[in-house]
Amino acid sequence: MDKAIVLAVAASLCTATASVCQRAGARNTGPAAGFDARLIIRLARQPAWLLGIAAMIGGFVFQLTALRFGELALVQPILAAELLFVFGFLAVAGPRRPKPRDWLAAAAMSAGIGVFLRLAAPSGGRLHAAGPSWLLAGLVTAAVVLAALAVAFGLRGRPGASRSRRAGVLGAATGISWGFMAAVIKELSSHLGDGIDAIVSTWSLYLLLAAGAATMVLAAHALAAGPLAASQPGFTILDPLTASLLGVFLFGEHIQTGAAALAGEALPLAAVIAGAAALSRSCLVLGENQRPGCPDQPATDRAAHAPGRQPVAASRP
């Protein structure tokens, strides 16, 4: 279990690095008016975005290895610490210093994750999930994504959501998709000791590749649609929650479910959610997206907001 925790923290650090690099690389890419499959092609021309992809791959490797040593319900909540690492990157290299409420939110989120894991005590589970269970989980995830696209971009001539709401809806769908991918990674990790032939012959590898490509496009649109404050809570909160639920549903992992245990788990989980929401709205995390109450933007940020230059972002798997 100790190895799984260390590897999950390393995965979280890598995905945070990927997020920061991809935001930097996407700064000069204009937002899409609707769903644009070519957005990834434009982003691939940015060196910083490619560096973010490399960090993202590193995060995938660490996550895959962590799931080899620990349960899905243990590993995924730790990955929610990604927002803390983003906070740290921006505190060191960003133009603004953290305020006391930023540090309080970070402490609440970090402590909440640790206490939740301690009380939930995830354990057990099987290596493989049944085919019908996978089919149901995949259909539900696909339905959520399609519904999010319809709400975000409109359907049958109806106008889509506003930019902020679009970012929030797509961010939520992306977080759920990442949680589903984590479950697929868990299935794939059970074949790591069987040799390369077993890995390339299993269906979970190809499902992971397809889901990963689709989720990358979805994440790019979520972060391109509007402020990071709108999309980041969906990434940070729904990813581990979805993965934990799938760990129980698909793999039979066990968490403490007694009345007293559930009541105790609810409090730190609420702290995690509140901390993630507060950090995602802070001036440090928003960065180039100015909001009332933040200090004046530095010259570099004002230049990024000059006419014809709209900052957007794209993120991890």
What would you call each of these model-derived segments?
Residues M1-P317:
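Polytopic alpha-helical membrane proteins, predominantly small-molecule transporters/carriers
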